Amino acid sequence: MQWETVIGLEIHVQLLTRSKIFSGASVAYGARPNSQACAVDIALPGVLPVLNRQVVEYAIRFGLAINATINSPSIFARKNYFYPDLPKGYQISQLAHPIVEGGHVTIRTGDKEKTIHLTRAHLEEDAGKSTHEGFHDKTGIDLNRAGTGLLEIVSEPEMRSSAEAVAYARVLHSLVRWIGICDGNMQEGSFRCDANVSVRPAGSDVLGTRCEIKNLNSFRFLERAIDYEVARQIDILESGGSIVQQTRLYDADRDETRTMRSKEDAHDYRYFPDPDLLPVVIPQEWIKQIREKLPELPEDRHNRYIRDFSLSAYDANILTAARELADYFEQTVKFLPEQIKLCANWIIGEVSGRLNKEGLEIDQCPVSPEQLAGLLLRITDGTVSGKIAKDVFDSMWQSNDNSADTIIDAKNLRQISDNSEIEKWVNEVLAANQQQVADYRAGKEKAFNSLVGQVMKMSRGKANPVQVNTLLKKHLIE
């Protein structure tokens, strides 16, 4: 039997505020356990929550970015369950009236585009953290994270493979960083994914029983966890068994999912409106002000790069993966507007490759857009070859005060374009390699590349490669 995978994601985005959603306690990462938990966070009797205006603005900003509806009023509800790191015995969340409803994003896998619709995005507080290591037969509770503001983003179950799920998660990860509401640090838990996975016979419209995989904090783990879970469910169904609805954890060391608890439904949490928090009424004028402050969004830039810069969808996709990278590209193009494709190639290749190798972000790049444009200008005007330019780029990276021209002159790297000098090297190479000359004339193209390499070696890489090719072919057909 052929099976179809059905995936929906719930993504928890930690909002980039300085204080918590309902208290003034700090949200700085890495503080001493329980040093950033105030009376509200630890649920002392008599204390009341006060909503942080900034988290509401961030939620509206996200909703506008995905063309969603901003609900007014929006209502907070109590989600009741017991867990040691949940001091109140309930979590303040949203159910019937989330702040953001609907919306969509576009994902790309290979050369295919697909629209993924969102169900909702709602505000809630994070729980604390249970620690089991270092406590013999006990559990340590750290409430520093309790009360941190989260935006939970829930998709429709429209993804059909782990690749689509990862593409969707990457789009949201890029978007929340792009609009400045989250730092996207997955290692610190700022962006966490829960995957709801089920399978059904191909062609069926009936959803299968789903299992939720909790707290996936890397795109690689998200992909591997989904692939394992799909295979597990298919194996059970083809063996005549049935899927039990449950919450599961992904064990990265063993590359498998395992049962955490039976999966609850909304009614199990006994939601009801929080009597300590008024409905949030959002004026249209405030929404308008937030909309006017939004930057050009990644999808709009992606389309503009294809339309105005004639870049491929692949190039545009990479360049708009992060706002800082797109800004770096556009600043480079401003200095070299006639060489847009060359700028794109170098930023995607040399610049991004070096950043990845050294674990740096684009805003830490020691070569500025102006310096990079200066180097690329020397390629286009024939001062240096592409190969030599890579050596110059390496020197610029190591000594960020140096311009391309300074390094080229200091190291005597200017390309030689004097026909008579290049012809002298060509004649010497041809005279010394009669067998390769004969091989080329007999139809062996590889012999030509060898001859080119020897001329470039003789010139210490400084001969103009276009002229070398032209002169070699001229002499070889004589």
Curated annotation (Swiss-Prot):
Belongs to the GatB/GatE family. GatB subfamily. Allows the formation of correctly charged Asn-tRNA(Asn) or Gln-tRNA(Gln) through the transamidation of misacylated Asp-tRNA(Asn) or Glu-tRNA(Gln) in organisms which lack either or both of asparaginyl-tRNA or glutaminyl-tRNA synthetases. The reaction takes place in the presence of glutamine and ATP through an activated phospho-Asp-tRNA(Asn) or phospho-Glu-tRNA(Gln). One of its GO terms (biological process) is translation. GO terms for molecular function: asparaginyl-tRNA synthase (glutamine-hydrolyzing) activity; ATP binding; glutaminyl-tRNA synthase (glutamine-hydrolyzing) activity. It comes from Nitrosomonas eutropha (strain DSM 101675 / C91 / Nm57). PROSITE patterns: GATB. It catalyses: L-glutamyl-tRNA(Gln) + L-glutamine + ATP + H2O = L-glutaminyl-tRNA(Gln) + L-glutamate + ADP + phosphate + H(+); L-aspartyl-tRNA(Asn) + L-glutamine + ATP + H2O = L-asparaginyl-tRNA(Asn) + L-glutamate + ADP + phosphate + 2 H(+). This is Aspartyl/glutamyl-tRNA(Asn/Gln) amidotransferase subunit B. It is an enzyme of class 6 (ligase). Heterotrimer of A, B and C subunits. The keyword Nucleotide-binding applies. Keywords: ATP-binding, Ligase, Nucleotide-binding, Protein biosynthesis. Its EC number is 6.3.5.-.
